[in-house]
Curated annotation (Swiss-Prot):
Protein name as it appears in the record: UDP-glycosyltransferase 79B4
Lineage: Eukaryota, Viridiplantae, Streptophyta, Embryophyta, Tracheophyta
Name of one Pfam family that matches: UDPGT
Natural source organism: Arabidopsis thaliana (Mouse-ear cress)
Enzyme class at the top of the EC tree: transferase
GO MF annotation, one: UDP-glucosyltransferase activity
Length: 448
C-alpha cells in the first residue's frame, strides 16, 4: 500500500534482545516508517550508537518500579544474576500503565514484543495491532509445543523427526523449561494471542518449522530474514595486519578457526580440552574465546607446555576479533563455533566447513536442524551424562570434515555450497525485509 506506519518496540530488557530489536527498528526506519523504542535510560545510552536513523527512531524511557529482589538501579539482565531474571519480568509487567499512557499519547499503529504476554490484550483494547517478534530460532519455538514428558520426541505434527532432543540435549532443555518456565509460558501465551507472529529466520532454513508454528498458533507467521547481516561480508574494511599476515603463512583452506562469542565462558577443564583437541588435529588453528571462569587471562589457563608445542601453527586469543573478515580469508578451511545466531549465519555464508559445539538449548536445536536435517555441518560428540566433549572427539570431528577423502566431509561440503549459493543470491535476504514490511502494512489496514 505504501502508507507509512508508526511502530512501538518493547523487547525483553536484555541486550541479546534489545540489539536485534534495534536492527529491526533500523530496517523499518530505512523503509520510511517511524519507530518508538521503549527502553530504560541506561540501556538507551548503549543502544544509541546502533541507531542509524535518529530522525525516525525515538527512544522513550521507561522506569522500572521497585519489586522485591530487584537491586536498586538494575534495569537489564546485565545488572542481574541468572537466578533473578524472573524479578525483571515481574518489574516489566508493572510497566503496563506507563506504556499505555505513551500509546494513548503517541498513537502508534502496532507494537512489537517478545516476552511480555499482556501486550496483545492491551493492544486490542487500544485499537492497535500486536506483533510477537521472536529472535530465537523457529526450531526452538516449535519445541515449545512438545509435551514436557516427551522432550525426546517432536510435538505431534512436527515436520522433522531429526530436530528432536536426546540424551544430554534433552537434559539441557528440561533444565531450561524448569528454570525459565515463566519465560516459556509468556512466549507461548504471546504467540497465541498476538495479531501477527514474526521470526528472525528464512524459509530456506526453517520454512517447515515456521509453517508448523503457524498451524499451532493459528496466526500468520512473517519471516524477516537475518535482518542485519551483509551476507557477503563486504564491509570494505581490511582484516587487521596481525591476523592477515599470520594467516597468509598457511595453505588455502587449511586453518581451523574456533570461536564461541563474547558472552560464553568455559570451565577451565573444558577450555583446556578444547585447546588440546585443536592441538591433536595437527592442523594450524586460531582459537578466539574469552578467558575461562576463574581466570583473568587466557595464558594462565593454557595446558602446561601447550604454547611451546603449538608455536608457529596455533594461537589462542582472549580478545575480540573481526570474525567475518577472518572467515573470508582464503586460508580458513573450518569454523568451529557454538551455533549462536551471528556465528551460524556467518558460517553458512562462508566457504568453510562447519563444526558445531552448541552450548544453549536454542543452539542445540538449530545445530540438529543444520547437522541432521540439512546436512551442512557436523556436531562434536559429547558425553551423554555430563555434556562435555573430549579432546579426542573434537579432533576426530574436525579431521572428518577437513580430510579431502572423507565421505561426511564431502557430503557437508556439497550441501553447504548449495545452501550458501541460495542464501547469497542477489537480493534474497533483502527481499525478506521488503516483503515483511509490505505484509505489516497490509495487516495494519486489515479489519481482522
Amino acid at each position: 500500500m505504501g502508507s507509512k506506519f508508526h511502530a512501538f518496540l518493547y523487547p525483553w530488557f536484555g541486550f541479546g534482545h534489545m540489539i536485534p530489536y534495534l536492527h529491526l527498528a533500523n530496517k523499518l526506519a530505512e523503509k520510511g516508517h517511524r519507530v518508538t523504542f521503549l527502553a530504560p535510560k541506561k540501556a538507551q545510552k548503549q543502544l544509541e550508537p546502533l541507531n542509524l536513523f535518529p530522525n525516525s527512531i525515538h527512544f522513550e524511557n521507561v522506569t522500572l518500579p521497585h519489586v522485591d529482589g530487584l537491586p536498586v538501579g538494575a534495569e537489564t539482565t546485565a545488572d542481574l544474576p541468572n537466578s533473578s531474571k524472573r524479578v525483571l519480568a515481574d518489574a516489566m509487567d508493572l510497566l503496563r500503565e506507563q506504556i499505555e499512557v505513551k500509546i494513548r499519547s503517541l498513537k502508534p499503529d502496532l507494537i512489537f514484543f517478545d516476552f511480555v504476554d499482556w501486550i496483545p490484550q492491551m493492544a486490542k483494547e487500544l485499537g492497535i495491532k500486536s506483533v510477537s517478534y521472536q529472535i530465537i530460532s523457529a526450531a526452538f519455538i516449535a519445541m515449545f509445543f512438545a509435551p514436557r514428558a516427551e522432550l525426546g520426541s517432536p510435538p505431534p505434527g512436527f515436520p522433522s523427526s531429526k530436530v528432536a532432543l536426546r540424551g544430554h540435549d534433552a537434559n539441557i532443555y528440561s533444565l531450561f523449561a524448569n528454570t525459565r518456565k515463566f519465560l516459556f509460558d509468556r512466549v507461548t501465551t504471546g504467540l497465541k494471542n498476538c495479531d501477527v507472529i514474526a521470526i528472525r529466520t528464512c524459509a530456506e532454513i526453517e520454512g517447515n518449522l515456521c509453517d508448523f508454528i503457524e498451524r499451532q498458533c493459528q496466526r500468520k507467521v512473517l519471516l524477516t530474514g537475518p535482518m542485519f547481516l551483509d551476507p557477503q561480508g563486504k564491509s570494505g574494511k581490511p582484516l587487521e595486519d596481525r591476523w592477515n599476515n599470520w594467516l597468509n603463512g598457511f595453505e588455502p583452506s587449511s586453518v581451523v578457526y574456533c570461536a564461541f562469542g563474547t558472552h560464553f565462558f568455559f570451565e577451565i577443564d573444558q577450555f583446556q580440552e578444547l585447546c588440546l583437541g585443536m592441538e591433536l588435529t595437527g592442523l594450524p588453528f586460531l582459537v578466539a574465546v574469552m578467558p575461562p571462569r576463574g581466570s583473568s587471562t587466557i595464558q594462565e589457563a593454557l595446558p602446561e607446555g601447550f604454547e611451546e608445542r603449538i608455536k608457529g601453527r596455533g594461537i589462542v586469543w582472549g580478545g575480540w576479533v573481526e570474525q567475518p573478515l577472518i572467515l573470508s580469508h582464503p586460508s580458513i578451511g573450518c569454523f568451529v563455533n557454538h551455533c549462536g545466531f551471528g556465528s551460524m549465519w556467518e558460517s553458512l555464508v562462508s566457504d568453510c566447513q562447519i563444526v558445531f559445539i552448541p552450548q544453549l538449548v536454542d543452539q542445540v536445536l538449530t545445530t540438529r536442524l543444520l547437522t541432521e536435517e540439512l546436512e551442512v555441518s557436523v556436531k562434536v560428540k559429547r558425553d551423554e551424562i555430563t555434556g562435555w566433549f573430549s579432546k579426542e572427539s573434537l579432533r576426530d570431528t574436525v579431521k572428518s570434515v577437513m580430510d579431502k577423502n572423507s565421505e561426511i566431509g564431502n557430503l557437508v561440503r556439497r550441501n553447504h555450497k548449495k545452501l550458501k549459493e541460495t542464501l547469497v543470491s542477489p537480493g534474497l535476504l533483502s527481499s525478506y525485509a521488503d516483503k515483511f514490511v509490505d505484509e505489516l502494512e497490509n495487516h495494519i489496514h486489515s479489519k481482522n
